[in-house]
Amino acid sequence: GPVAAVVRELRCVCLSTTAIHPKMIARLQVIAAGPQCSKVEVVASLKNGKEICLDPEAPLIKKAIQKILESGNKEN
């Protein structure tokens, strides 16, 4: 996808962030800080097919990231 291409270029994916209602989000992708970008980035895939960047510092987004991390760490 477009995100993978940007990561290969070794720069941040998100140039700006957008505030959006959580109900419009289909999928969240958290990109950890690394050599390509010094900050954590959150890319949301919306139900209408668009991809936008969310502010990882926003309280609602922090909660969502926490949920993702917790669910990812659980053994099934």
Swiss-Prot record:
GO cellular component: extracellular space
Disulphide linkage map: 12-37, 14-53
Pfam families attached to this UniProt entry: IL8 (PF00048)
Tissue/organ expression: Alveolar macrophages.
Main location: secreted
Family note: Belongs to the intercrine alpha (chemokine CxC) family.
Role description: Has chemotactic activity for neutrophils.
Name recorded for this polypeptide: Alveolar macrophage chemotactic factor
